[in-house]
């Protein structure tokens, strides 16, 4: 007989971790666990009060059966032993013996993981405990007095371990660390030593001596080569082969050496592996998908008790790929649902998956044209954005849509053109891109018959949905089907590809929600292209691409996640509909004026009480992935909101003057009746504890649930009746009393003095010096029946819960509309909070295109500056008698760019519906804002700085309309002065004469000031400059006389940041060089060269003027005007 193995005793009333979700139970009658985790057979003697004894194995004993089950039923194969570094028990590698005493004696998850309080008595009755059927291997140390022999045996084993592990220090890794640290630190995981080589020879050498479980994993991996598999093995999730190396790098966990590929490293008999605890799966899955990996969860699809009762008890546990996730499809992030705080750092994540396809390029060079189709879906909220458009060689249209949508994942159908491919790589290829994180890119082929196949697949998909939902809404669903079938060919191709793609992740149901399809190109919003979003810092700042300092950051005072998402849409798509805009502005004004009134306080209080992301939770309900506590939170939150406004029967009952506010508030109580009907069916206390067995009230439980509960009750009655029969066999008059030790129930304790009365058919489970504990054959049989009922009950509870979620999903549209109205109220209250800031005013809107602002300020800089921001006035209008363009000059760092951004941002704020930072604002509705600011090259399109500058300018000239605002900053600086001036003057003249839009033109070319004289009325273009003061040798120098003696390096420049009439005759570049601490010797040389060049230029101008004078004297009147202009410039 081999040497006994020590199995630690761990008190555990029941193992609820067989079910998902779990509930916690406190241990009872626990024996203390061992103080350390010594290697196999290296154990210390137990205490004198409780010494484990060797289990007696009889022909009728269940111990052999359980041991066979511990090996996954693989009687013909030898399993490798594994030595864990942080567990106190010895478990078989396959981890499939769910009912093993060794497995059940493991350290159970803490109560903080499984629930904050004990389940109800009703639930305890149905909790499955695999321990109850186990025969714990707790052998007694028979040779306790032979200390010398024991020491020699330990020393021999130690030498073997040293030889096996390579060096003595390696064994330190098997010492368990503090369990509290394991619970508290996400990076400390269950680690394993490399398994010892199997000494016995196995059959099937051609399979590389892999275990049946590893062969299962290998088979799944072959079918999903692009997926990182996370495999459930007992109480852990494990990674194998190359997946283990990848996971170890991302998660900072230990990778146990072994073969990384099946077809390589033939000298190794086992795969490399890494493992994580079961309760840490959501955290690590989120980290893996955030790193850009596609992960698959492989779960055991059968449980120990049902497997033992079935015909396949001698085969490994069946494992299947149950879930696949990527960054865009990971909707199981429960942590993110309970917080209203935005993620810190990085760009705001939208969670969109974007599918893109395009036709082959037509034309060549700058005449290249491509037709593009996009479809973006947000699985977490059910929103869709689609578009079909033509784009030029700069791909500015694609860039605009990508920056607006900010996808977290791309699906590319077919091949993209070279320019588009480079754009996608540029925007997503690094961790420092404008989206704030690395973007995952997947590709699918595009055969020549893709269009026809896509129409067929989409039509079939929605036709099947229509058949499956024959109801009163049949007409509405038919209308949605027709809407989908009217989509253009490129969009249909994207839709078909996306349906196929989402089906792999089990999220194809999101395409039922075609009500929320939205076209990006719908001209009901102001167009903000990609350059404008970046230049004006709409979503992120230009310094570190974070949200702080952006326009969205300035306006975001929302209290809910879904309100924050809606506000982001509002910021990127300012309104063009004057009626809707005035309704929104009026609502904000009313909320601002009534900020401390009871009705507004009630709205704020209601939003503050929303602790979860209702919009995402609703989609999880729709997908059938919602947890019981999450469902309870959603239903109770919706009930609380409905009760708060139960008195509102019609919109006028809300008590507001604003139609928008009244309609939003009136929609909130509509959901009350539906929510209450669902809450009446569930047990709130059980739902809060994630208790599946008591979730439904008894009258609403399904027949199957009741049947299995009755079965469990009958078995427990049989166990109670068996007490008398057991007592009679022990010659006792009173019924025996069952005891529970280390989580093993229904033990019969017999004093060692009465062991001769115990029948041989009784299986000894454990014992002490004074007592022994047994299971009778009848108890083993009853417990097996009870466990089968419990596992069937667990499955029935899960099935009933999914049916309950499906029933709630039938009211998806009503609940979604209520949440949307709640988000609208959140956004309006956020804008009202901004309007309450000092110095903000309500804008008024006109039918003409104009911008008339008094005392305007930059909304973001004002909040970031510690000092007061200097306000400025602006007056632009497309009326013939007014100025529609400003030519802005001034010294470097004088505030020119901040001023033009301020004008644009005030226009955007007004059309969002917000108050604006100004004393007064009278604005027309702009259909677009176009900017050309900054200097940068474009390596991904192989374009120089000047090429990018002119390409963007050309795009603006083609796109701008008389209702647009165009901002051009230092156009022409990327080339020589003469060419730059020529291009800048031509563009300025075209914008003012031909396009006739509002324009702000910044330049350092003072000669452009003469363009204003070329207009008949002299008002269309006006020269302004950023005011400043200059002191030279203690004397103030006026702007008019600033350039008489050239620039002096010792001049002190004071920026006034005010807009004044006229032209600034100098840019004071040397002043900026001095502020930048350029060496004084360099500054002196630069000042000298500057004076020389200016003198040379003046000399040339004088020479030219002298020639003109001679021509004028010869009666050449045509040159008289040129003469006058030249003299003014001098």
UniProtKB/Swiss-Prot annotation:
SMART domains: MUTSac, MUTSd
Chain intervals for the UniProt region annotation (Mispair-binding domain): 207-328
Recorded superkingdom: Eukaryota
GO cellular component labels: nucleus
Residue numbers binding ATP: 890-897
Region: Disordered, residue numbers: 1-152, 168-207
Role played: Component of the post-replicative DNA mismatch repair system (MMR). Heterodimerizes with msh2 to form MutS beta, which binds to DNA mismatches thereby initiating DNA repair. Msh3 provides substrate-binding and substrate specificity to the complex. When bound, the MutS beta heterodimer bends the DNA helix and shields approximately 20 base pairs. Acts mainly to repair insertion-deletion loops (IDLs) from 2 to 13 nucleotides in size, but can also repair base-base and single insertion-deletion mismatches that occur during replication.
Family, similarity comment: Belongs to the DNA mismatch repair MutS family. MSH3 subfamily.
Official protein name in the record: DNA mismatch repair protein msh3
Organism: Sclerotinia sclerotiorum (strain ATCC 18683 / 1980 / Ss-1) (White mold)
